[in-house]
């Protein structure tokens, strides 16, 4: 009987051991599932954070590019402003320059008038030199081909000695500042 008792005890021990093993395995499975869930949650969180980081990096790069564009535009505006800074002054002085030209076109036999005209011519030439220093030039007209970018045709001519579309007379001088026309030349054009 003791042998039977021993067998029963051994059997009970084995069953108990198996139950413990099953419990351990089920606990490990639960722990693995919990760990897998935790990993999945952590991975999802990592993915979410990586996406947010990518989004923030993209925004940063766009803002940096926008800043560079604004900076370049500011430099271009400043350069254009510097390049054409004397345009408004030239526009204001052109009527006075026209008056000088009309006055200098007169002739007189009186010595006093000749002296005054000589002084006016000196002032006129000084203004032209100042214009030249600022990049303001007279637009060539007589003998040139008509160019609507620089000339304004106000009259037509029928001169056989001149080529077609050639400027035969200048009624008012035109001026340009570097590459920008301040005032087009008013001209008479051959047909």
From Swiss-Prot:
Q: PANTHER family of this UniProt entry?
A: GRPE PROTEIN (PTHR21237), GRPE PROTEIN HOMOLOG, MITOCHONDRIAL (PTHR21237:SF23)
This protein is called Protein GrpE
* GO cellular component, as recorded: cytoplasm
Q: Name one GO molecular function term.
A: adenyl-nucleotide exchange factor activity
Q: Which Pfam families match?
A: GrpE
List, alphabetically, the NCBIfam families matched: PRK14140.1
In the record, the note on similarity to other proteins reads: Belongs to the GrpE family.
Q: Does the keyword Chaperone apply?
A: yes
Q: Does the keyword Transit peptide apply?
A: no
Tell me what gene encodes this: grpE
Which segments of the protein form a coiled coil according to its record?
none
């Amino acid at each position: 009987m003791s042998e039977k008792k021993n067998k029963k005890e051994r059997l009970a021990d084995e069953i108990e051991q198996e139950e413990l093993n099953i419990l351990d395995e089920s606990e490990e499975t639960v722990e693995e599932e919990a760990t897998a869930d935790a990993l999945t949650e952590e991975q999802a969180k990592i993915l979410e954070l990586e996406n947010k980081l990518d989004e923030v990096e993209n925004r940063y790069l766009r803002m940096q590019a926008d800043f560079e564009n604004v900076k370049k535009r500011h430099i271009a505006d400043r350069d254009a402003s510097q390049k054409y800074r004397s345009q408004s002054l030239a526009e204001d002085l052109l009527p006075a320059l026209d008056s000088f030209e009309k006055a200098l076109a007169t002739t007189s036999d009186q010595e006093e008038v000749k002296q005054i005209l000589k002084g006016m011519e000196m002032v006129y030439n000084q203004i032209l030199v100042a214009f030249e220093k600022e990049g303001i030039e007279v637009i060539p007209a007589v003998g040139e081909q008509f160019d609507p970018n620089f000339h304004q045709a106000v009259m037509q001519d029928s001169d056989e000695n001149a080529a077609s579309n050639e400027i035969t007379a200048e009624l008012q001088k035109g001026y340009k500042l570097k590459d920008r026309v301040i005032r087009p030349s008013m001209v008479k054009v051959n047909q």
